[in-house]
Amino acid sequence: MVTFLKLREWQEKAFPLWWEKKRGIIKVVTGGGKTFFAIHCLKRYLENDPQKSILIVVPSIALLDQWYDSLSQNFDDKEISLNGGGEQTKIITKICISTIDSLKNIISLIDAEKTLLIVDECHKIGTEKRGEMLTNAWHATLGLSATPERDYDDNFYIIIKKILGDIIFDYDYIDAREDEVIVNFKLLYGYAALLPEEENKYKKFTKSIQRRAATIGGQDMNDYPLKMLIFNRARLVKNSKNRIPYGIELIQKYERDSWIVFTENKKQAKEFNKIVNKLKGFNSGIYNTDLNDDERQENLEKFKAGNLNVLVSCTALDEGFDMPEADGAMILSASSSKRQRIQRMGRVLRITANKENALIVTVYSSKTEYEKLREESNRYKLEGVPVKWQQMSL
């Protein structure tokens, strides 16, 4: 007999919307309980027809492991097979969990017409190559993401929506905060000024962008020269030299039990980690692909156990991975996409017994970053989220 655990209020509302057609995308804030919701859906699906199967597609090995841990509490291990991260199944069991990049090894073994397809972090399937693997006649579909829409292309409509269906339920930060599903949080925006030579280059790029846009009659991102000017200006800002010292200043000023720090690249991560480890009271580690699987796992376990109180990453912790221990997040580049910012904020908003609130710090260095953040801050302020702006004292 399948046991059904008590659903949260939003899950009670969302389930019948999905069950009616057994198709659609659930847009849920990170930490809101989308995995729990999906497990409830697949349990009901299998109870309704035990002859059916489940395929769960995830973007990373970390999420593969997390899904396995959650499902193994609800199903016999013999019913679950893994594909990805060194595991390659040859027999499709009742429930199969696969990373996106390993899916090609087993997709021909799946009977789509008898399968519920669940795609976690479903914005990740929005490429032509990945989409092609999943354009089957699935019996049922369920997409999960805090950010299903994509910032820089129309592939949500062209690819993702065609495979999984419409967004049928939206549960955002404000809803989750009101329902006490996530902790209360504060936002701090810190201005790390460009150095004089960086400021001069920034102004030159901006003038060149304006001239090119005037020449072609607007900001057409298909225009390669314009695209490269914008790219090079963004790279200048992302790598501005004051970001790291200001981040170090802030991490010392605002006391937190533990921090996750998101840098722009591996070089920044290495430099930030090196400096923090010289500070009294801080033990820092890195989590990125420069480390092997065992080293990354070791640093995660140390962080969870409290032996590290700072974990520095580039993009490896962006999506899906549970880090409830952290109550501070620092985003060293405000130029990241809206989707990426939401994912990163979500890393520290999960409720734990001793967490009173979370602090999310974003460092910015340019007018373009400021304008984007000002719009975000105004939206959160209207909902009662404490917001503070300051600039570096160095």
Where are these regions (language model features)?
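Conserved pre-motif I regulatory segment
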Residues: M1-K27
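Walker A/P-loop
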Residues: K21-L42, F262
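Interdomain linker/hinge connecting the two RecA-like lobes of the SF2 helicase core
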Residues: K22-I25, D170-W259, E264, F272-N277
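Conserved helix-turn-beta segment of the N-terminal RecA-like "Helicase ATP-binding" lobe
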Residues: A62-G86
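Conserved helicase ATPase core of P-loop NTP-dependent helicases/translocases
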Residues: S81-K90, S258-F262, K267-N277, G281-D318
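A short beta-strand element within the Helicase C-terminal
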Residues: K114-T115, V310-C314, D318-S335, Q340, ...
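Post-DEXD/H (motif II) to motif III coupling segment of the RecA-like Helicase ATP-binding lobe
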Residues: K124-F185
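A conserved SF2-helicase RecA2
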Residues: Y173-V183, S336-M345, R350-L394
